């Protein structure tokens, strides 16, 4: 009588499969941590944010302090600073001084505050306004043509030229700069949101909501708005990087933040005069500007790849 020998279950294969499944990222936060672009861009941007917040503590001297006898000093120059009580303390100009004797290091640190505030404010305002317009334009058909013609007209004008034109109409200041930069960014958000709405408007679950008498605002909030969150987060990073660059360009051209305010653009505008002799006045703010824009763009690329449902499906 023959007997059938049962093969033992392949615990090793099951264990390996379980381990592989356990090692895969399962939540959006795990997906973000598994993306090197998100980690790199986020880390650099976090350092820049901390630098901006801690500028009063990290700076060696008041950025507006003028000392003509110490003008155009090379990086690493040391000197004694006289305080209000008459005492003196040693300080080091880590990035040298400009043509008025102001500390470049302190001015660059304080300049990061302006750049990051402008970038974040423009991104938030552009997304808020563009989202509202895009939702209405994409869902209400008779408004779509009117809205898109206005958006096409705005996009036909180069953003930097439109920003300069808007700056010429108002007094210079950070609020005016934010307004002048965020207006040209609105069409980009509107077109993105409108495209998402058009792709969702004919979905069965939206038609079902319409058939049971759901109001248009409720449909937009409940069914359409959630689908725009991930693309808008990614778009917001690109708008932030663009706004930081445009603010620096406006200040560099002398039509942005007032010259006495320490911004990266203003510092570079002053440093270009003696760039061939004292390059540090332009070099250091330029490095901070380039690194910040690079970090924001890399973060945006990482978020785009991570929040893409197709990639999330492959990784999960």
What are these regions (language model features)?
Residues 104-109, 136, 150, 193, ...:
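Short hydrophobic alpha-helical segments within the ABC transporter permease transmembrane module
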Residues 1-127, 131, 135, 160, ...:
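Gly/Trp-centered helix-boundary motif
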Residues 45, 107, 148, 152, ...:
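Residue-level recognition of transmembrane alpha-helices
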Residues 155, 167-171, 181-182, 195-197, ...:
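Glycine-rich helix-loop "coupling/hinge" segments at transmembrane-helix boundaries
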Residues 56, 130, 134, 138, ...:
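Juxtamembrane/transmembrane-helix interface segments of polytopic membrane transporters
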Residues 56-64, 138-143, 171-172, 197, ...:
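Transmembrane helix-loop junctions in multipass membrane proteins, especially transporters and channels
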Residues 94, 120, 124-203, 207, ...:
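Generic hydrophobic transmembrane alpha-helix motif, especially the helices
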Residues 17, 21, 97, 139-142, ...:
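Residue-level signature of the cytosolic catalytic core of signaling kinases
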């Amino acid at each position: 009588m023959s007997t059938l020998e049962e093969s033992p279950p392949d615990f090793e294969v099951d264990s390996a499969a379980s381990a592989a499944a356990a090692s895969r990222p399962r939540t959006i936060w795990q997906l973000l941590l598994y993306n090197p672009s998100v980690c790199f861009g986020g880390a650099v941007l976090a350092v820049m944010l901390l630098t901006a917040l801690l500028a009063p503590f990290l700076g060696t001297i008041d950025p507006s302090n003028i000392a003509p006898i110490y003008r155009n000093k090379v990086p690493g120059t040391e000197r004694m600073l006289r305080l209000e009580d008459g005492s003196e303390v040693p300080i080091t100009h880590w990035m040298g001084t400009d043509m008025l004797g102001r500390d470049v290091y302190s001015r660059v640190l304080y300049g990061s505050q302006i750049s990051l505030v402008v970038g974040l404010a423009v991104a938030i305002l552009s997304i808020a306004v563009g989202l509202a317009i895009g939702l209405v334009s994409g869902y209400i058909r008779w408004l779509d043509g009117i809205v898109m013609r206005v958006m096409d007209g705005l996009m036909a004008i180069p953003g930097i030229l439109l920003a300069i034109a808007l700056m010429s109409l108002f007094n210079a200041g950070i609020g005016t700069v934010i307004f002048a930069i965020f207006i040209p960014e609105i069409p980009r958000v509107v077109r993105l949101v409108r495209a998402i709405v058009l792709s969702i408007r004919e979905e069965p679950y939206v038609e079902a909501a319409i058939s049971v008498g759901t109001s248009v605002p409720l449909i937009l909030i409940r069914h359409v708005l959630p689908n725009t969150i991930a693309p808008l987060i990614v778009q917001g990073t690109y708008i932030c990087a663009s706004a930081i660059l445009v603010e620096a360009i406006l200040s560099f051209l002398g039509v942005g933040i007032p010259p006495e305010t320490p911004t990266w653009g203003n510092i570079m505008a002053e440093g270009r005069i003696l760039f061939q002799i004292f390059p540090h006045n332009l070099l250091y703010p330029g490095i901070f500007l380039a690194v910040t824009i690079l970090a924001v763009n890399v973060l945006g690329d990482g978020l785009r790849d991570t929040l893409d449902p197709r990639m999330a499906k492959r990784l999960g």
